[in-house]
Amino acid sequence: MAEMSYRTALVTGASSGLGRGLALWLARRGVRVFAAGRRLPQLQALRDEAQAAGVTVEPVELDVTKADATLERIRALDAEAGGLDLVVANAGVGGTTNAKRLPWERVRGIIDTNVTGAAATLSAVLPQMVERKRGHLVGVSSLAGFRGLAGHAAYSASKAFLSTFMESLRVDLRGTGVRVTCIYPGFVKSELTATNNFPMPFLMETHDAVELMGKGIVRGDAEVSFPWQLAVPTRMAKVLPNPLFDAAARRLR
């Protein structure tokens, strides 16, 4: 693994799941971590766990669906930290959105968090990182973003947005000193997947997924996809002709 070069990091969606795990993973390696999320009690419990281990995690109450407030708060954190070295846009929500009964409220909730919230989180520090000629932006997308999955129109589309957003940032920021990484998890045990009522092949333990994420981020990988058993066929499905993909997708409903 490459040498850890981060002094400070912000991880959104750190109340549980991958965000919580990554915040602890970074803190245990000497990084001062700002753990952001909507549920302050869970963040305070995370801080206490970190303190018991002799490391630093600072809770930050933040609702990324409120874009203007998110921009303001993260910019203030950047100034307080003397420049955030790593920002991980991890906050996300799921939920089914069957096109036959497409509830706008649910669609909007997914877009507000997964699209607007992620873009605001990363945009808040991007100009400062470019000016400093250093920094690392990470977006947590999903393997579900490669094709439109049945019953997940809003979720798949929101993750497709983030994937393309991160790719464009990576191209634009080449040579600036700012690195860009996009994470593509498959199914990971978390609050997000606990309510799923459909098969989840190659379901991963959270700590295993966090280890893959953390190592990929530190290496500066452009993309980190896991588990490979699901990542490989998912990427191959990207080039399937529509009739073949549609037939396969119908079987997965």
Swiss-Prot record:
Superkingdom classification of source: Bacteria
EC main group: oxidoreductase
Residues given in the record as substrate binding sites: S142
Annotated TM spans: none
One GO location term (cellular component): membrane
Active site annotation, chain numbering: Y155
Entry EC no(s): 1.-.-.-
InterPro entries registered for this protein in UniProt: NAD(P)-bd_dom_sf, Sc_DH/Rdtase_CS, SDR_fam
Alphabetical keyword list: Oxidoreductase
A GO molecular-function annotation: oxidoreductase activity
A Pfam family it matches: adh_short
CDD domains in the record: SDR_c6
Residues the record lists as binding NADP(+): 10-34
Keyword Ribosomal protein: no
Family: Belongs to the short-chain dehydrogenases/reductases (SDR) family.
Protein name, per record: Uncharacterized oxidoreductase MXAN_5909
Source species of the chain: Myxococcus xanthus (strain DK1622)
High-level lineage: Bacteria, Pseudomonadati, Myxococcota, Myxococcia, Myxococcales
